[in-house]
């Protein structure tokens, strides 16, 4: 009864914690002839993390003076994390939102050019402590959950760490609409019993074969691009 599972999926923390612990006990039980297999999983996948694009502002050490990115000061500064929800696509910080966010910013002095306070950006682990966590609820509201799922698969190989960037999500949404329109026309389900052409059957079976192979290999990003 006790045999290996088909697939084990875990991140880097699992590889140095849970996985190490569980493999130790599997080897131990195998050496005692209590289980029939040496490894408890047929396939191991360490999925990469979705990284966040953090935002920082420069603060003069020991003061409440903050400087926009393009302003160079001959003073010692340190970078402070700020919430990415206050930063627009041009890396401009909403100072009013920042002042209302935490007491330390309420009476601080912010120096910028042309009334545009530019933040520093850096890709790092997505974490609440770094204020770079993206809430998917807004994406689901704007584009739907299917678009979010498909876009995540399309970001890249499952094993690689990937920075979160929604720049291409509108293209994924458009693809799903086109796919939907293949079977729905003017609000009605559109399927007929006409015999498909040889070319259509060739494309169909080629696509089925590609997707089946990619799913078995967990190459979900290339499976999506096959469409």
What is the role of each PLM region?
Residues 198:
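Gly/Thr-rich phosphate-binding loop signature of adenosyl cofactor/nucleotide-binding cores
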Residues 190-194:
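NTP/phosphate- and nucleic-acid-binding module
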């Amino acid at each position: 009864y006790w045999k290996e599972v088909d697939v084990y999926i875990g991140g880097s923390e699992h590889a140095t914690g849970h996985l190490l612990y569980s493999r130790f006990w599997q080897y131990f039980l195998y050496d005692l002839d209590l289980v029939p297999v040496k490894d408890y999983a047929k396939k191991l996948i360490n999925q990469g993390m979705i990284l966040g694009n953090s935002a920082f502002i420069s603060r003069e050490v020991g003061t409440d003076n903050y400087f926009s990115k393009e302003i160079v000061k001959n003073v010692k500064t340190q970078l402070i994390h700020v919430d990415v929800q206050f930063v627009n696509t041009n890396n401009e910080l909403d100072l009013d939102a920042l002042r209302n966010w935490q007491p330390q910013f309420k009476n601080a002095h912010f120096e910028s050019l042309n009334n545009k306070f530019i933040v520093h950006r850096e890709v790092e682990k997505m974490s609440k402590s770094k204020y770079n966590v993206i809430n998917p609820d807004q994406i689901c509201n704007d584009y739907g959950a299917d678009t979010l799922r498909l876009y995540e698969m399309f970001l890249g190989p499952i094993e690689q760490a990937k920075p979160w960037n929604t720049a291409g999500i509108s293209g994924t949404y458009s693809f799903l609409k086109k796919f939907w329109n293949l079977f729905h026309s003017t609000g009605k389900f559109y399927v007929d019993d006409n015999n498909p052409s040889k070319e259509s059957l060739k494309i169909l079976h080629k696509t089925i074969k590609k997707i089946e192979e990619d799913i078995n290999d967990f190459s979900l990003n290339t499976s999506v691009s096959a469409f």
